[in-house]
Amino acid sequence: MSKVAIIDFGSQFTQLLARRIRDLNIYSEIFLPNVAFDLIKGVDAFILSGGPRSVPNSDGIPKIVHDILQFNEKTSIPVLGICYGLQILSNYFESDVVSNCNKEFGKTILNIIKNSKIIENIWESGDQACVWMSHADSVYNIPRGFEVIAYSVLNNSIAMVANEQRRIYGMQFHPEVYHTPDGINLLANFLDIAGCQKDWTVTSFIDDQQDAIKKQIGNKKVIAALSGGVDSSVAAALTYKAIGDQLHCVFIDNGLLRYNEVEKVKQLFINELKIPVTIVDKSAVFLNRLKSITDPERKRKIIGETFIEIFEEEANKLEGVEFLMQGTIYPDVVESGGSGSIAKESVVIKSHHNVGGLPKTMKFKLVEPLKYLFKDEVRILGRNLGISTEILMRHPFPGPGLAVRIIGEITEEKVKMLQAADDIYINLIKKYELYDVMWQAFVVLLPVKTVGVMGDRRTYGHACVLRAVNSHDGMTAESFPFCMDEETQWKFFKCIQEASNAIINSVNGINRVAYDITSKPPATIEWE
């Protein structure tokens, strides 16, 4: 199978870059700059990502770049540098990189001045092209052995270079973002130059992952952390397909679930997937430990530690359990700061209960069969495993549950309030036939009360916020319905108006409803 190694220097777009390459049916994997070269030298191509580093203000060229380019000198294995990746390549080939010079952010027009294999059948000399830039440093002069393919119209700075003989290419812009219209075609050309075969599919992933699970587990037993969501359901189905009754599924009722969730889990796993499940009610334990806790990171840590403690109790009832299966996916690892080959150089956004919330004393070895997949890939995998569309299209639900949708202190009363409001909202979205055209929708309960009037009397109740977003892979998101057609927009506005009335009239304790229109970034999809 063809494979592309992406060296991640901390770009916010690295995960998107990996996803775009997979869209071309070529497997890509992300590695930190401190990876040992021997672990990655068997790939078909290298890509050096962008990132916040500055060549003029750094301690020199990273060792991994030296290793890759020395290997390229012997083998001509293709190398692509993007943004900072271009700058570090240029510096290696004796070009000057200047800090805070010719900055460019956003849409930029290029003048194409020379033909190259990297732009074949896309652009040609004399064309102008639209791309997306995000850089403060610039390559000042032409790297040794390279030719300039394009300059920026804005300031005549170097935007694209090529060394055709050694098959090394550099782009100051970001071909991986959707704002570079021809970006996917440029990546496809680079992968064609590398001779990559389009042989990565979900079907091949299933076969490979089953073999990997069997090899990792041997004759031991696995206890599975089920949530009832898409990720853990698909992970359980894949693992069960690989090892059968060696998998023991446990569903913990933590008291922070969606309305009637336990019954839905029974229907899903026992009736549809035919996978045995042990259901354990520990809602009182979770709510007691979360009493008076308001900090979202502490909530996540407490929930993660409590989950593991309970799983260890359940595992002790079985013999030979050494592994814990989780439905961790790529964005979970990214937002938690990551671990291993896909760790980020960026800051931690939030701890994911499957990743950053796990206690260091955890006794289990982890089985995470989906940790290299994005959400849409997980759904494709689920369809190939025979899981129904209704299950696969369930909106994402956070591992810590309603704990991160109740801002501030958590009480049983607030949980019931939020469950009722969320159930009303989701059912109305389904009534208006909008559920399947959005990525995620939910209600957030705020820690503030507002004055209202009901039945000629003053009320003083909680405010809640409705949220709905569209996304492709969970890495970025747009507020719904502003990205949709006019008919869908009006339908949704009627829906949230009806939801507001229904929540206020039906849910005791809520007297005001607002709507969140913030995109990701700058916000995350969840509030905590």
UniProtKB/Swiss-Prot annotation:
One function term, GO molecular function aspect: GMP synthase activity
Alphabetized UniProt keyword annotations? ATP-binding, Glutamine amidotransferase, GMP biosynthesis, Ligase, Nucleotide-binding, Purine biosynthesis
Catalytic residue positions: 83, 174, 176
Report domain GMPS ATP-PPase positions.
Answer: 200-394
| EC number assigned by the record | 6.3.5.2
Q: Which reaction does it catalyse?
A: XMP + L-glutamine + ATP + H2O = GMP + L-glutamate + AMP + diphosphate + 2 H(+)
Name the GO cellular-component terms.
Answer: cytosol
Function recorded in the entry: Catalyzes the synthesis of GMP from XMP.
In its UniProt entry, what is this protein called?
GMP synthase [glutamine-hydrolyzing]
Q: Which organism is it from?
A: Ehrlichia ruminantium (strain Welgevonden)
Gene for this chain: guaA
